[in-house]
Amino acid sequence: MPRTFLVVLIYILAGFLCSTSALRKVNEASGIKTDGSGYTIVEECCTESCKLEEVNEYCHLFRGRFFCGEQILDIYNTVCNPRSIRRKRSLTVDKREAKKFIRQRR
């Protein structure tokens, strides 16, 4: 019985990994940029709603919601840079660091 459970679990995990890598390949083939952590980078959007123009080069579509401007800083701090949370640094970054982060995403 435990062996059957283990085999089923392995098949489920393998299916999940294959589906996520296949989705990533489909996105790359269709020109959709992804950063591997569930974000889809959508260029030239959120231009009117963004307050921080230096970070307003593109926004992220994450789990059906758009994030742009100052919200990119929140994404950077909470998801894209988890080491900053582990070091217990402040959850805000300056504009230079955010611009550097965006340049690296291209």
UniProtKB/Swiss-Prot annotation:
Instruction: Note whether Signal occurs among the keywords.
Output: yes
Pro-peptide residues, renumbered to this chain, are: 23-37, 86-106
Please verify whether the record's keywords include ATP-binding.
no
Please give the InterPro entries that the UniProt record associates with this protein. Answer: Insulin-like, Insulin-like_sf, Insulin_CS
Q: Where is the signal peptide?
A: 1-22
The UniProt keyword set, sorted, is:
Carbohydrate metabolism, Disulfide bond, Glucose metabolism, Hormone, Secreted, Signal
| UniProt cross-references to PROSITE patterns, sorted A to Z | INSULIN
Annotated disulfide bonds: 45-50, 46-80, 59-68
Where, per UniProt, does this protein localize? Secreted
- Domain of life the protein comes from: Eukaryota
Q: By its UniProt entry, which Pfam families does this protein fall under?
A: Insulin
Q: What does this protein do?
A: Insulin decreases blood glucose concentration. May have evolved to activate insulin receptors (INSR) in vertebrates. Molecular docking studies reveals unique interaction with the human insulin receptor. In vivo, insulin-like peptide injection reduces blood glucose levels in two models of zebrafish diabetes (streptozotocin- and glucose-induced). Also shorter swimming distance of zebrafish larvae, an effect which is not observed with human insulin.
Protein family membership: Belongs to the insulin family.
What's the protein called, per UniProt?
A: Insulin-like peptide 04
